[in-house]
């Protein structure tokens, strides 16, 4: 996946990235990009949820249930979103419906095999940490991982969206999020 991104950037003459925004499981791909590729990145924003650390057996057990949950979003045209997430906001339904449509069991299994691992976090340079934000919603389940992330990335920025759940601020206030 990383090499596909590198080829795409190269084919389009992109030599520097202004901002990477990564959330949930996709943040593992962003972290791999940041640690393996030498293309300069000016700013990074991570939603805190991807820093959950879940054991291998639990992740393996999660795959069929998560697969059915994600596929149900497509099959139901988004009606099951409120059962899976904290919201059923019409702004995000199309993205989840499309994700459910395109999801394959094998891809999800591979993604969870190397995501959310219970292992040390990847190293980032002091300079990149200063321009990186790890956001957590104060009421999201993954808030409990915030201290471990703060101890690893001591030069980073750690805003807390008070009273918000996982990705809730970004979805409900995209203008405020982009100003931040």
Q: Where would I find each of the regions flagged by the language model?
A:
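Conserved serine/cysteine hydrolase catalytic core
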Residues: 113-150
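Conserved alpha/beta-hydrolase catalytic His-Asp/Glu region
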Residues: 56-58, 73-126
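Short, hydrophobic alpha-helix immediately C-terminal to the catalytic nucleophile
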Residues: 30-35, 178
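Active-site loop/oxyanion-hole signature of alpha/beta-hydrolase fold enzymes
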Residues: 1-19
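Flexible "cap/lid" loop of the alpha/beta hydrolase fold
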Residues: 35-71
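Catalytic histidine neighborhood in serine/cysteine hydrolases
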Residues: 152-167
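Catalytic histidine-centered segment of alpha/beta-hydrolase-like enzymes
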Residues: 164-176
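Gly/Ala-rich beta-loop-alpha elbow adjacent to hydrolase catalytic centers
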Residues: 21-30
